[in-house]
C-alpha cells in the first residue's frame, strides 16, 4: 500500500522549494457540498496532486472542500480538467489565481476536517447552501459609493490591519468562529439594510452570508471569489481597484500587494509598514508588523526580551558546535 502523506523533513522540503526554478501558479478554491466518504475522497486527491508535484494545503470535510495550492504551470490545465471531472459537484469549479506567484508552499498536506472552515455553528436547521447574492467588481464599486450600503470585513484583525476596503467595518477577532458570534450582535440594527461581506477568497464570507440570512438579515451580498476575485475582475474590465493596501495570505508569502497605500504601522516604532514576520525567537513566534529599521535593531524579534533570549540561544548553539 502506497504512503499517502509526506515523509520528507521540513528542512529538506524548504530547501527544495528555495532552489526550484520551475514556474508555478498559486491557486485557491472551495465548494460547500456533501462528501459521503471523506477518507476515500482525500486519498484520491492526494494521489493525483502528488503525481503532478502539487504543494499546498487541502481540507476535506463532509461539508465540502477548501484548498490553497501551488501548481507547476505546465500542469495547470491538466489539474483543472482533473478537478472538473473528479466530482460532478466540482464541474466548472471557480478557481482563484493568486495576484502573484512567489513561492507559496513547500509541502503537500491533504487533511480530513470536521468542517472546511471552523465556524462554531451548532444549529441543526442551519443551511450553508442558502447564501447571499454574489456581486462582481462593477457592482462592488457602485455599492462602495452608496452610503446606505454597509461593508463588513470577515477576516481576522491582523488581516484587516494591512488592507481593507475604505470604511469597511472590522469585526475585531482572531478567529472566524468568534466573528460569527459578534457580527449578529453588532449589526442587529441593520437587518433591513444592504450588507456586503467579504474575505480573501470567498469561503468565509459565503458562510457568513448564510449565517446572516439564518438570523433574519434581509439583504446580504458577498464578493464572488472574495478580494482575489474582485481584483482580477476589476483589472480585467478596466475598473478602479478600491481595495487599499495588501491582502494577507496564509502561506509562505504572507501577503499580496494590491495597491501602493501602506495603511498599517510597525509594532515597535509606529512607522508606516505592512511587512508581517514571525518573531525570530522560536519559543515566541509572534506574528507582527515590523519595519526595516526595527528588523535590524531587534534582530527580527518582537521585543528586547525576545531579542536577548534569541541571542542567548544562538550563542549556546555556536558554543556547542565549537565543543564538537
Curated annotation (Swiss-Prot):
Reaction equation(s) it catalyzes: uridine(34) in tRNA + AH2 + O2 = 5-hydroxyuridine(34) in tRNA + A + H2O
Enzyme class name: oxidoreductase
Sequence ranges assigned to domain Rhodanese in this UniProt record: 145-239
Keywords, in A-Z order: Oxidoreductase, tRNA processing
Keyword tRNA processing set for record: yes
Single GO MF descriptor: oxidoreductase activity, acting on paired donors, with incorporation or reduction of molecular oxygen
Enzyme Commission identifier(s): 1.14.-.-
Record-level GO BP terms: tRNA modification
Active site: 199 (cysteine persulfide intermediate)
Family recorded in the similarity comment: Belongs to the TrhO family.
Function text: Catalyzes oxygen-dependent 5-hydroxyuridine (ho5U) modification at position 34 in tRNAs.
Cited HAMAP family: TrhO
Protein name: tRNA uridine(34) hydroxylase
Organism encoding this protein: Buchnera aphidicola subsp. Acyrthosiphon pisum (strain APS) (Acyrthosiphon pisum symbiotic bacterium)
Lineage: Bacteria, Pseudomonadati, Pseudomonadota, Gammaproteobacteria, Enterobacterales
Gene: trhO
Amino acid at each position: 500500500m502506497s504512503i499517502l502523506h509526506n515523509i520528507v523533513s521540513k528542512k529538506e522540503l524548504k530547501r527544495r522549494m528555495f532552489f526550484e526554478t520551475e514556474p508555478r501558479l498559486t491557486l485557491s478554491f472551495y465548494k460547500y457540498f456533501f462528501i459521503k466518504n471523506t477518507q476515500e475522497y482525500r486519498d484520491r486527491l492526494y494521489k493525483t496532486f502528488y503525481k503532478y508535484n502539487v504543494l499546498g494545503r487541502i481540507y476535506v470535510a463532509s461539508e465540502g472542500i477548501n484548498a490553497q495550492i501551488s501548481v507547476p504551470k505546465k500542469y495547470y490545465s491538466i489539474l483543472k480538467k482533473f478537478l472538473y471531472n473528479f466530482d460532478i459537484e466540482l464541474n466548472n469549479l471557480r478557481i482563484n489565481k493568486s495576484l502573484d506567484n512567489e513561492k507559496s508552499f513547500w509541502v503537500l498536506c491533504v487533511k480530513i476536517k470536521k468542517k472546511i472552515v471552523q465556524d462554531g455553528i451548532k444549529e441543526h436547521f442551519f443551511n450553508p447552501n442558502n447564501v447571499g447574492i454574489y456581486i462582481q467588481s462593477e457592482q462592488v464599486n457602485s455599492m462602495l459609493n452608496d452610503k446606505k450600503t454597509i461593508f463588513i470585513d470577515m477576516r481576522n484583525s491582523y488581516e484587516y490591519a494591512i488592507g481593507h476596503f475604505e470604511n469597511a467595518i472590522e469585526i475585531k477577532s482572531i478567529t472566524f468562529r468568534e466573528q460569527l458570534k459578534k457580527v449578529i450582535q453588532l449589526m442587529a440594527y441593520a437587518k433591513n439594510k444592504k450588507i456586503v461581506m467579504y474575505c480573501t477568497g470567498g469561503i468565509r464570507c459565503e458562510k457568513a452570508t448564510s449565517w446572516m440570512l439564518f438570523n433574519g438579515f434581509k439583504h446580504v451580498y458577498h464578493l464572488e471569489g472574495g478580494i482575489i476575485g474582485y481584483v482580477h475582475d476589476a483589472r480585467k474590465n478596466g475598473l478602479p481597484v478600491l481595495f487599499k493596501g495588501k491582502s494577507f495570505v496564509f502561506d509562505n508569502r504572507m501577503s499580496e500587494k494590491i495597491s501602493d497605500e501602506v495603511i498599517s504601522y510597525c509594532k515597535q516604532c509606529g512607522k508606516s509598514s505592512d511587512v508581517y514576520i514571525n518573531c525570530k525567537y522560536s519559543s515566541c513566534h509572534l506574528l507582527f508588523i515590523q519595519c526595516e529599521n526595527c528588523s535590524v535593531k531587534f534582530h527580527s524579534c518582537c521585543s528586547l526580551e525576545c531579542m536577548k533570549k534569541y541571542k542567548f540561544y544562538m550563542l549556546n548553539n555556536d558554543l556547542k558546535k565549537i565543543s564538537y
